[in-house]
Amino acid sequence: MFSRVLFSILFFLGCCPSLFADVDSPQRATFGQPAVMLGIAIVFFYFILWRPEQKRRQAMEKRKSELAVGDKVTAMGIVGTIAEIREHTVVLNIASGKIEILKAAISEIFKAEK
């Protein structure tokens, strides 16, 4: 919703000079207007798209560093309980045995209740 409103405002601002320009005056190419629009687009992408994703990624990395034996995790649709933690992998107990997966493949972490 917010992004639609922001896009509408940016579109209107981009069209404003052509709406209110005199018909008789010649249009001259300026660097200012495209530079301002590019700056607004960069700020938009930073605050709306990139920054929240960066925060989410940092929070997940922190949670992965705090993994403990007994935590329940999901990885690529597989749900298991951590049996062993290694440097870059974890060993999961699943219904039919154990599997080893990369820590990077873990998508959700459910802490073990103590």
Swiss-Prot record:
Subcellular location: Cell inner membrane
Annotated GO CC locations: plasma membrane
Record keywords: Cell inner membrane, Cell membrane, Membrane, Protein transport, Translocation, Transmembrane, Transmembrane helix, Transport
Gene Ontology biological-process annotations: protein transport
One Pfam family cited in the UniProt record for this chain: YajC
Broad class of the protein's primary localization: membrane
Chain segments annotated as transmembrane: 30-50
Signal peptide range in chain numbering: none
UniProt key word Ligase: no
Topological type in the membrane: Single-pass membrane protein
Subunit-level organization: Part of the SecDF-YidC-YajC translocase complex. The SecDF-YidC-YajC translocase forms a supercomplex with SecYEG, called the holo-translocon (HTL).
Job of this protein: The SecYEG-SecDF-YajC-YidC holo-translocon (HTL) protein secretase/insertase is a supercomplex required for protein secretion, insertion of proteins into membranes, and assembly of membrane protein complexes. While the SecYEG complex is essential for assembly of a number of proteins and complexes, the SecDF-YajC-YidC subcomplex facilitates these functions.
Family, per entry: Belongs to the YajC family.
Protein name in UniProt: Sec translocon accessory complex subunit YajC
Record organism: Chlamydia muridarum (strain MoPn / Nigg)
